[in-house]
Amino acid sequence: VLRPWHLAPILSLRTPALAVFASLALAACSGGPSGMPGFDTGSPGAGQGQPASTGQTIGNGKVKVGLILPLTAEGQGAVVGNSLRNAAEMALAEFPGADLTLLVKDDRGTPEGAQAGTQEALREGAELIIGPLFAPSVQAAAQVARSANRPVMAFSSDSNVATRGVYLLSFPPENDVNRVIGYASAQGKKSFAALVPDTAYGKVVEAAFQQAVADRGARTVAIERFSGDANSMRAAVGRLAPSLPQADALFVPAAADTMPALGLALQQGGFDPTKVKPLGTGVWNDGAVARVPAIQGGWFASPDTAGFNAFAGRYQQRFNSAPTRTATLAYDAVSLAAALARTQGSQRFSEAVLTNASGFAGADGVFRFRPDGQNERGLAVLELRNGQIVTVNAAPRDLGPKTQ
């Protein structure tokens, strides 16, 4: 069945041949230990040293694309990997006349598996590698792909593994931070404090926070870090309290596993969200966070959920299960590959085409790849209001001039 959502937006972007639309949705699984979809710092460690399994093919088109996923990794890795695989299959089935064959390889969640799977896919004629998911696996796959002069479109949100020819199609937390600080600054917030988790994710968002505040000529008045126990949270709030009267906003990117307890510590410490605006990231896009009293009225940035919800409905119907939150990434990657194969001829996966400044329209909104491999996304700003999540500033439909 040909679906109209692939066609309408192709007419709407500035570079029509390069636009592809993928209508996606939201589920409840994160791709890494941080709780941020797709943010990872390592691999699950299954099957060390084993080669990738030969896997199967999806589709029968002339253009071959490798799909490297942790299908039999330990724990959540396999759950996410199989959801990504299903989404890739769905994208191919829904794209009208897709001329692709996906060469599916199981990397078992290891760098060794990713290296072997990439080598196998390239031997079988892959022009593009989609995946892997985990950062160490991306590095291993990239090394092989680079020697064959083939690009990689990976799902890690660890910006350290992005480089020329290795494009991250993911949800980088830096994008969330930049968007919400930019919005707060535009609303007149000039001084910022931060209370960040003492984790790998916390380090990434703290650095992004400092950069975003500096870029807007604003002031950072204090930064405190907390670990997961209640005593650490209370101590961090206590250290922060003397600086809060100087702050217009408090950046507190805590996820559902810690935000309720941290919110209680903030309340007990006298924090008033009507005087200091709470700010967060996409980890706030969770009902358990939305109900925390201490951050009501707070703003955070996240992909618009309408596209994901549409995708999730179709996925549920097709596979009789809910997709993980990161499943949209594989759907968009395969839809994009199919669109470029149709419209761009022999240049379909060239650097110039993949880093097109107008970007692409996907399930989670508009995005584009930078020459350094990182991505920029059009994100919405949402507000926690009476325990609900409401949009206060819609995601842009156009990304504007490139930042790099």
Please report, for each region that a protein language model flagged, where it lies by residue.
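Segments of small-molecule ligand-sensing domains
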Residues: 319-393, 403-404
